[in-house]
Amino acid sequence: MNSSETQIPESRAARRRKNRILREQRRRRRLAYITGLVCALFVVVLTVLSALTPDKTFSANENRNLKQRPSISADGLLSGSFFGDTATHFSDQFALRDRWISLKLTYDKLIGMKESHDVYLGKDHYLLQKTVEPDEKALDDIANAVNSFASLHSDLSTRMLVVPCAAAVLPDKLPGSAPVRNQAADIDAFGQKLSGVAFTNASEALKSSNDSRNLYYRTDHHWTSYGARTVYEKCAPGLGIDAPVTEFDEYLLSETFLGTLGSQSGSFRRRDTIEIYVPKNCPNYYVYYADQGKTVSSLYVRDKLNEKDQYQVFLGGNHPIVEIHTAASTGKSLLIFKDSYANSFVQYLIPHYDTIIMIDPRYYFNRLDNVIQANGITDILFLYSANTLLADHSLAVCLNASA
């Protein structure tokens, strides 16, 4: 017999190895089939649930409107917009959507992700807004406008207070190796552009605080009432306040505050507390909202605690102009140009001025001379968060309109 035709008997060991391989292949095929079937059923069940569940119009956690079911039209089909709108609708209205978002965020943290939707996932449950890159052209425009305004009103005491964001003050809360600008230096660089303006950088006042209370909210980009109080107490001389109040009545307003960074990042579980500090023996006052034609007796709008953005408890949010008239009898009246950081700071200024006018240049488009004359303004304060000021385009427009 030809040796090439001779068959070598298969050994028992070889047959066992072959059988093990075949069994493993069958096991993997069954597992893949079961996994695929479970995933398919899971998707089908969630799709059916999503289809049967009425559409939500608003996501309180994300603080935004949700995509509604698109209507079918020839134009939409031909342009392809219908299919894109359908995909967005399905994503927005997916069953148990908030839980999936939270689960995804938990997974991201476990695998070492440092941020979610441009929000740093910090230590001790801090969510931190990134420091902005200064817009040098905008800053030159702002500095020129502020300098011109101060020169035009040289008879008034003009000051500016700039507050850094949490990432610049609490570097120990940042995730490892997270890049962050030296915002204190950015603030100082802007201050050097000013003339005729008493400038205060709040960075050191906040960094030097050794109190255990939070200076910033963990889920929001604003400072807390205590952070604002810290700057008020430490920076009072630079703000023209010779004798700051040192005793306050503290009140807890909320333990369920989910801020903008919680909404933006998808971190919905943790909640912040909102406290206020009312100066003892605070003079009587009233607040007038010109855009609403409404007068009230408190800075705090408690109805806002029932809404998503509970930070609006301070003055009800942002308005073009707010008037505060007090019984302080100091002979001084203050005009504040501001962003929303001032909303929780103004509570400390009540004892020091007879009148406080707050203008938000993002929404105010009238002339300023009439405001200054009608209210006997003696002092000007520009109060901004650094992340707003260093990329702002509205303040210069507002000031130049009245030049």
Task: Label every model-predicted segment.
Residues 1-403:
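Extracellular glycan-modifying ectodomains
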